[in-house]
């Protein structure tokens, strides 16, 4: 008879913030975080970034090159900031799919967009970035904003994104990264591990989720490492743009 404790010991581990957890548990733990913060996610984004997240997303939209009639996949689309803008660009002949693995975030995004009259050319799909349930060569543009760091197997997710893109299609990864200036990095560390959990406690009554978010940012690959991962996954002409001193980076890659 097999010993379940030995099986757990042999299971590969991954990071959940600064903790090492069995790979099979990470998705569930991340889900708990976003179930907790979904209702006030937009408010917290504004508070924690001072509204800068709107500028970062605007630049993502500009660099995406989305045009009328395009088909766009917004992975980890959450409350629908990018989806709403993309839907207005692609128009009635195009399509935007807002995909999120977390049903609480997906519901908030769907309700928010429907309240704003965004309908007709938008679909909402609960989906795992590592195993996207879409046909090969299907989308003109795929985006993932502030979601890749929460994925357990990032390499698998990047390959899955490549698969669903049309040849010549573009992937854009907007994510927290590593500041290049040591002084800025020190200030950012203090802000992340002091102010973020405090704000989480005061606004959502959940300091732990925002402590995890700060830790997950530190564990995410830096700019050059993520660029190399995208190249290894099969993307070409991979570039990145640092924003706010490298606190955030936007990577773009093209499917051959």
UniProtKB/Swiss-Prot annotation:
For biological process, the GO terms are: aerobic respiration; menaquinone biosynthetic process; methylation
In the Enzyme Commission scheme, what number(s) does this protein have? 2.1.1.163, 2.1.1.201
Transmembrane stretches in the record are none
EC top class, in one word? transferase
For this UniProt record, the keywords arranged alphabetically read as follows:
Menaquinone biosynthesis, Methyltransferase, S-adenosyl-L-methionine, Transferase, Ubiquinone biosynthesis
The pathway where this protein functions is: Quinol/quinone metabolism; menaquinone biosynthesis; menaquinol from 1,4-dihydroxy-2-naphthoate: step 2/2; Cofactor biosynthesis; ubiquinone biosynthesis
Q: Which reaction does it catalyse?
A: a 2-demethylmenaquinol + S-adenosyl-L-methionine = a menaquinol + S-adenosyl-L-homocysteine + H(+); a 2-methoxy-6-(all-trans-polyprenyl)benzene-1,4-diol + S-adenosyl-L-methionine = a 5-methoxy-2-methyl-3-(all-trans-polyprenyl)benzene-1,4-diol + S-adenosyl-L-homocysteine + H(+)
Coiled coil regions in record: none
Question: Which PANTHER family does the protein's record reference?
Answer: 2-METHOXY-6-POLYPRENYL-1,4-BENZOQUINOL METHYLASE, MITOCHONDRIAL (PTHR43591:SF24), METHYLTRANSFERASE (PTHR43591)
What is the protein's known function? Answer: Methyltransferase required for the conversion of demethylmenaquinol (DMKH2) to menaquinol (MKH2) and the conversion of 2-polyprenyl-6-methoxy-1,4-benzoquinol (DDMQH2) to 2-polyprenyl-3-methyl-6-methoxy-1,4-benzoquinol (DMQH2).
- From the Swiss-Prot or TrEMBL record, give the protein name: Ubiquinone/menaquinone biosynthesis C-methyltransferase UbiE
What is the source species?
A: Ectopseudomonas mendocina (strain ymp) (Pseudomonas mendocina)
């Amino acid at each position: 008879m097999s010993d379940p404790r030995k099986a757990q010991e042999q299971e590969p581990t991954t990071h959940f913030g600064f903790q090492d957890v069995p790979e099979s548990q990470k998705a569930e733990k991340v889900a708990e975080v976003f179930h907790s913060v979904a209702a006030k996610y937009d408010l917290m984004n504004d508070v924690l970034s001072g509204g800068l997240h709107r500028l970062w997303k605007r630049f993502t939209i500009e660099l995406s090159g989305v045009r009328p009639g395009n088909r766009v996949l917004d992975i980890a689309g959450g409350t629908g900031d990018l989806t709403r803008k993309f839907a207005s660009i692609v128009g009635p002949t195009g399509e935007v799919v807002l995909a999120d693995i977390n049903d609480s975030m997906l519901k908030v995004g769907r309700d928010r967009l429907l309240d704003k009259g965004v309908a007709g050319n938008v679909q909402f799909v609960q989906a795992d970035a590592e195993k996207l349930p879409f046909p090969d060569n299907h989308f003109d543009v795929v985006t993932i904003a502030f979601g890749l760091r929460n994925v357990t197997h990032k390499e698998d997710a990047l390959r899955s994104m490549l698969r669903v893109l049309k040849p010549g299609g573009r992937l854009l990864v907007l994510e927290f990264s590593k500041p290049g200036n040591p002084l800025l990095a020190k200030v950012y560390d203090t802000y992340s591990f002091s102010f973020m959990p405090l704000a989480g406690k005061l606004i959502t009554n959940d300091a732990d989720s925002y402590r995890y978010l700060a830790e997950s940012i530190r564990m995410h690959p830096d700019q050059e490492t993520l660029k190399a991962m995208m190249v290894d996954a099969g993307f070409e002409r991979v570039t990145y743009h640092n924003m706010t001193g490298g606190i955030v980076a936007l990577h773009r890659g093209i499917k051959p």
